[in-house]
Curated annotation (Swiss-Prot):
One of its GO terms (molecular function) is structural constituent of ribosome. InterPro entries: Ribosomal_uL5, Ribosomal_uL5_bac-type, Ribosomal_uL5_C, Ribosomal_uL5_CS, Ribosomal_uL5_dom_sf, Ribosomal_uL5_N. This is Large ribosomal subunit protein uL5. This is one of the proteins that bind and probably mediate the attachment of the 5S RNA into the large ribosomal subunit, where it forms part of the central protuberance. In the 70S ribosome it contacts protein S13 of the 30S subunit (bridge B1b), connecting the 2 subunits; this bridge is implicated in subunit movement. Contacts the P site tRNA; the 5S rRNA and some of its associated proteins might help stabilize positioning of ribosome-bound tRNAs. One of its GO terms (cellular component) is ribosome. The keyword Amino-acid biosynthesis does not apply. The gene is rplE. Pfam families: Ribosomal_L5 (PF00281), Ribosomal_L5_C (PF00673). Belongs to the universal ribosomal protein uL5 family.
Length: 179
C-alpha cells in the first residue's frame, strides 16, 4: 500500500477529527483528485511540440494525458477553434497518492529557492492550485532529452468545505506552507 494513503488513514484522519470535531465519518475532508495541466502555447506554430509535452506529462503522471483544444478563435494569437493548445491529466485513487508522494518528497525539494506555498493559493472552496515552472524537477524527466523547459499547473481538489480544513489536510501530507 502507498505510504501517503496509509498516512492519511492512520494519522491525518485522527488529527482532523480532533481539530474540527467532525461527528460523521463522511464529513472528514479527503483529496478527491489531482489535475495536472500543461499549456503549450508554441503548439500554435509547431504542432509537433504537443507530442513532446504529452510524453513529458505521461512520464510525470504515469497515465496518458488528453489533449486540450482551443474553445474559440483569437486572431491576435493566430489561434483557431479546436487547435491543440495543451494537455492535462486527472489522477485519482492510488496514482493520485503516488504522485503527491513524489511531488512532496522528490520534486519540491529540487525547486530552486522554494520556501513553501502561500495560503492565498486556495480558492475558497478547499481546492489548492499552484504552478511549477520546470518539468525537470521530476526525476522521470531526462534533462538531455527534453526540447524545452515547460511549466505546469497542479490543482489538488479536496472534499473540504473551507480553506482552513483543506490547509490542515494538506499540511498533514507535509506540503510546505508559509505565512
Amino acid at each position: 500500500m502507498l505510504r501517503f494513503k496509509e498516512l492519511y488513514k492512520k494519522k491525518i484522519i485522527e488529527s482532523l477529527k480532533k481539530e474540527f470535531s467532525f461527528k460523521n465519518q463522511h464529513e472528514i475532508p479527503q483529496i478527491k483528485k489531482i489535475v495536472i495541466n500543461m499549456g503549450v502555447g508554441e503548439a500554435i506554430a509547431d504542432s509537433k511540440v504537443i507530442n513532446n509535452a504529452l510524453n513529458d506529462l505521461t512520464l510525470i503522471s504515469g497515465q496518458k494525458p488528453i489533449v486540450t483544444l482551443a474553445r474559440k478563435s483569437i486572431a491576435t494569437f493566430k489561434l483557431r477553434e479546436n487547435m491543440k493548445i495543451g494537455c492535462k491529466v486527472t489522477l485519482r485513487k492510488d496514482r493520485m497518492y503516488d504522485f503527491l508522494e513524489r511531488l512532496v518528497i522528490v520534486a519540491l525539494p529540487r525547486v530552486k529557492e522554494f520556501r513553501g506555498f502561500s495560503y492565498k493559493s486556495f480558492d475558497g472552496k478547499g481546492n489548492f492550485t499552484f504552478g511549477l515552472k520546470e518539468q525537470i524537477v521530476f526525476p522521470e524527466i531526462n534533462y538531455d532529452k527534453i526540447d524545452t523547459i515547460r511549466g505546469m499547473d497542479i490543482t489538488i481538489v479536496t472534499s473540504a468545505k473551507t480553506d482552513q480544513e483543506s490547509k490542515f489536510l494538506l499540511s498533514g501530507f507535509n506540503l510546505p506552507f508559509y505565512n
